[in-house]
Every structure is written in C-alpha cells, then in structure tokens.
C-alpha cells in the first residue's frame, strides 16, 4: 500500500524589495510579487497544475518585506523530482532552484516542509512592520533611500508616542481600513511605537514599529499617516481621537506612501498549535 501524501505543503520564507512591484497580489499586465514567484515555480516545479501561493501578508504596491511567509502545495511526485545532482534534499533544492531563476529583487531565504495544518495566513499569531522616515527634509543614505520616506517636516517623538498610545488594543479599525465585502476590521493592535535611531543601519531615521494579530487593507500606512499629522504639529490628540472613532473610513487620514514600509516578521505558534490557530483565525473576529 502506498502511504505517500498526494501533495506536500511547503513553507517559503521570502524577502523582496517592493519598489518595482505593484504589490503582492497577482494582477493582469502588472508586475507583482505573487505573479513573479508563481512564474518561477512553474519553471522549477514540473507539475500539471501551477502551484498557487498563500501569503501571510498581502503587501501593497511599493511595500517591502524582510520576513514574508507563504505556503504552497506541491504534488508529491513533482516534489520527489526536485533533488539535484548535488544531493540536496527537496526543500533545499527548491530554494536554490527558485533563487537561480528569480529576479534580484526577490529571494527565497528558506524552504521547508510545513507542519500538519499549517496555513501561512491563518496560522500566524502576529505580523510586525517597520516604517522608516527621514524627517525635516533630510535626504536619507542613498543605500537605503528606496526603503525610507523623506518627510518635509520635523517630527517630535514624544508627540508621536503619546498619539499612538490611544490607538493600541483590541478595537474596530474601520476608520483606518479600506472596506472589503464580508471582511471584519476588528484587530488587536499590540504595538505602535516610535524611536529615533542613533546607530546601526537606521541611524538618524525615525522608525515606527507596528505589531498586530493581523492588519486590514492599508491599515498600517493609514495609522502611520494619521499619527504623523500629530507628530509634526499639524493636528492634535483630540483630532486623532475623533477620526479614530469614525464608523467608516475617514477621508481626513492621509495614507503614508508604501515605500517606507517593510514587513519585518510573521510570528507562528509551535508546530503542534498551527492547525488549531488556523481554525480559530478563520472565525470572524469580534470585540467580545
């Protein structure tokens, strides 16, 4: 009796520079991360049907990722054909072959067989983003400028932090989200913090760290855009409180440009818990 699985679920850990992509999601006639990866998979995985990717975070146009995660199901027969003459195992061979055909602005950092029940989107417990800003009109280092927003006004870290504290917690973020049919806008925003770095790759940049269980469409950039208006003195805390409590998306909130934003990390529970987490997440979020 053949007990081999019909498909093998594979986890891909990815990084990409989003500058020249129209976002993650496949779109006709546009260069997207998903479309580029799936085209590479079609070349590497010789299967009758094209493997489809499920991703942890569907990044918008221009948004980058250092720690993106996706999964796909590969037919078992095609999976067994992957090892090369260099005697790599299937996962190592898949990553190496993909990186050989992918453009320079995407890299597969690792490929691995996913634990039972793993879902890149629904098993995740947290996403962490960073938004990088060079304020007061100062030009950022040319080596990082594609990932940094040049902001014309000076920012006050104390004002940014005070404004952000009022937004964290489990709440309805409809004022900061582009509505999608049947999708909830209730999220648990665990951190929205700001710091001015003094050393390292981000030296002299203002960096926002944003963590939540998940984010709805344009939520991170809307949060950043709203808080920036307080941090540069154009708005006050009362204004932010009013727009945050709006029952629908507020036109008063300027969405921050995509190129300053990077998906840094996606967090998952232990292998034994990923299936349970996926089942829980598929249930609609409520405030109860």
PLM regions: where:
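Structured-RNA-binding interfaces characteristic of tRNA pseudouridine synthases
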Residues: 2-288
């Amino acid at each position: 009796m053949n007990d081999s699985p019909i498909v093998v679920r594979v986890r891909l850990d990815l990084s990409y520079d989003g500058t020249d992509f129209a976002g993650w999601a496949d779109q006709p006639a546009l260069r997207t991360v998903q479309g580029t990866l799936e085209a590479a998979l079609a070349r590497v995985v010789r299967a009758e049907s094209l493997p489809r990717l499920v991703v942890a975070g569907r990044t918008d146009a221009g948004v980058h990722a250092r720690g993106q995660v996706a999964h796909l199901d590969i037919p078992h027969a095609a999976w067994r054909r992957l090892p090369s003459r260099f005697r790599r195992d299937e996962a190592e061979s898949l990553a190496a072959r993909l990186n050989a055909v992918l453009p320079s602005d995407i890299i597969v950092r690792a490929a691995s067989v996913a634990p039972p029940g793993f879902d890149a989107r629904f098993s995740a417990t947290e996403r962490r983003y960073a938004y990088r800003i060079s304020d007061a009109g100062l030009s950022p280092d040319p080596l990082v400028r594609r990932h940094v927003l040049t902001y014309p006004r000076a920012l006050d870290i104390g004002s940014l932090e005070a404004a952000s504290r009022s937004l964290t917690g489990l709440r309805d973020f409809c004022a900061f989200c582009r509505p999608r049919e049947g999708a909830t806008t209730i999220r648990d925003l665990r951190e929205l913090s700001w710091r001015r770095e003094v050393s390292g790759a981000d030296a002299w940049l203002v960096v926002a760290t944003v963590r939540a269980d998940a984010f709805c469409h344009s939520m991170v950039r809307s949060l950043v855009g709203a808080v920036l208006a307080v941090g540069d003195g154009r708005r006050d805390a009362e204004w932010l409180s009013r727009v945050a409590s709006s029952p629908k998306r507020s036109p008063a909130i300027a969405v921050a440009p995509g190129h300053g934003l990077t998906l840094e990390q996606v967090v998952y529970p232990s292998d034994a818990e990923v299936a349970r987490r996926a089942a829980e997440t598929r249930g609609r979020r409520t405030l109860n």
